[in-house]
Amino acid sequence: MINYIKKSLSLSAVITGEMATDDCQRLESLKNRLKGQFGVPVGVHMTGIPLAISTLLTIFCYAMLQVSVWMLLFRLLGLPEFKVMMGVFLAAVVYCMIVMSTMFLTARGSLTGYKLHISVITLTGLMSIVYFIWTWISLLFGSVENYTPQITSLLGLGFFGLNIVWMNTSVFYRSIALTLHNRVWRKQLKIENRQMAGLKR
């Protein structure tokens, strides 16, 4: 079901391990292997769009449960509800900073960044599942005047599902292979520049 996600994680782990060398020939060989993974040099996977779409879907999924969660939290703590929007805003800023950081790390070919990106998506997805169950139980066993929580919980679950489907495509997999290729390339260039600087001395 999530074969491409597993493949991209496995590829990232293998390349990260094999990058631990200063041999430019081995790095060139790694680059060539990765070129075979991301395929044709022109396509959506070359633009960074796949990772950006995944990030946006994660943010949309999180946004769907924000207001209801903060309303519930403020009621439990006995805080005035007019301050809810302040809580929503601050939490959204922190969340966006976290998810954007994982996106940029993933775009640089970082295995840790990619694992964190998947962890953030998984955690957000679990929150949306809990929110979905809670809102629909409230609808079935309680008196509900406003159906907004049920609609937003359904949308949140939809965004989470779309994100998983999107990350499990060959386009997304090839975009991860490209980020790894570029990371290897950057390391190769650094080594070559260092060697050139040594020769000039």
State the predicted function of each range.
Residues 58-66, 80-101, 123-127:
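Generic alpha-helical transmembrane segments
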Residues 100-126:
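Loop-to-transmembrane helix junctions at the membrane interface
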Residues 63-77, 108, 130-141:
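Juxtamembrane "helix-exit" motif on the non-cytosolic side of transmembrane helices
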Residues 36-44, 76-87, 141-149:
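Membrane-interface segments at the starts/ends of alpha-helical transmembrane spans
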Residues 128, 135-187:
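Alpha-helical membrane-associated segments of multi-pass integral membrane proteins
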Residues 5-10, 171-201:
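Short, highly charged, low-complexity non-transmembrane loops/tails of multi-pass membrane proteins
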Residues 47-53, 73-85, 112-115:
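Short juxtamembrane and helix-loop transition motifs at transmembrane-helix boundaries
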Residues 9-61:
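Cytosolic juxtamembrane helix and N-cap/initiation of the first transmembrane helix
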